[in-house]
Amino acid sequence: MKTWNDGKTIAIERCVLPLDASLHKGSSGRVGVLGGSARYTGAPYYAAMASLQAGADLAFVFCAQEATLPIKSYSPELMVAPVYSASDFDPVRLVDDMVNEIGDMLPKLHCLVVGPGLGRCPLVMKAVARVLELARSQQLHLVLDADALYMMSLPVYRSSLKGYDRLVLTPNVVEYQRLFPKSEDNNGESMEDASDEELAAATIVRKGAEDRIIVDQRQVMSCGEEGGLKRSGGIGDVLAGTLGTFTSWHAILLDREAVSTEDLPLSCWTACCAVKRATKRAFDDKRRAMTAPDVLHHLGQALDEMTRED
């Protein structure tokens, strides 16, 4: 499948959580975003807001104390929790406090998006690795983006999620080559060596002009929806948050036994189609002035129209 029209019927049936009067707050998805540092505060905001615009009910941001006030000031809709401080020079306390703070929240989530604005502090990555272990033990859906992908390229962490099939990775071309250095696939045409034993169970969303969904070293589908021509910073974070919503819906439908784990790539493809459409609308509206907030503005309407099309 390439465009939304190629697969919309099955995608709506198996990937979009129905709305009905029996739902309560949180029934349509609770997404956590682990990211945000003193230097990077926009990325976790874009990811969390995208999850809400795509249809999730609640969005949490777990970030550095230094990022808390800026992110809170961007929107009252986000629940923002400081989980560590960059000024804490006790490495054991920093890691333990971060793991405990986030660990208490994991049972309340349907999906955890990790990486937007995270930074590459070794202590933070050490704590994140422990959080991922906890999430895996609870069968929580995970979306890894940005600095979390860099972390997974490091030998010390690479096998930490080996065999986990509720994992989505979202590399761009550069991140993909860092994750899979043996791959000679610069144009996305050949999938040989596109994965390895450690990450073979993951669903990989390789971002580009045509987003490609890769599972077990082979491309299973691609998103050929037309997007905008402007590559503004933050659009990848919008996709990460949208994937957070769709993987949350997958988790909810999985609990209802309405879908199987094999439907996760289809959920990712649907999220890619939605963001491409929103990006195209934003670009048509703003052209060169388009930025990530413009994509957020169009995301909900684009997704609603997609699911209502005859």
Swiss-Prot record:
Role according to the record: Catalyzes the dehydration of the S-form of NAD(P)HX at the expense of ATP, which is converted to ADP. Together with NAD(P)HX epimerase, which catalyzes the epimerization of the S- and R-forms, the enzyme allows the repair of both epimers of NAD(P)HX, a damaged form of NAD(P)H that is a result of enzymatic or heat-dependent hydration.
Positions annotated to bind (6S)-NADPHX: G117, N172, V173, V174, E175, Y176, Q177, R178, D237
GO terms, molecular function: ATP binding; ATP-dependent NAD(P)H-hydrate dehydratase activity
Keyword NADP recorded: yes
Biological source species: Phaeodactylum tricornutum (strain CCAP 1055/1)
Pfam family, one: Carb_kinase
The protein's name: ATP-dependent (S)-NAD(P)H-hydrate dehydratase
PROSITE patterns, per database record: YJEF_C_2, YJEF_C_3
Keyword Transit peptide attributed: no
Catalytic activity: (6S)-NADHX + ATP = ADP + phosphate + NADH + H(+); (6S)-NADPHX + ATP = ADP + phosphate + NADPH + H(+)
Binding locations of ATP: 207-211, 227-236
The family this protein is said to belong to: Belongs to the NnrD/CARKD family.
Location of the YjeF C-terminal domain: 8-306
SUPFAM superfamilies: Ribokinase-like (SSF53613)
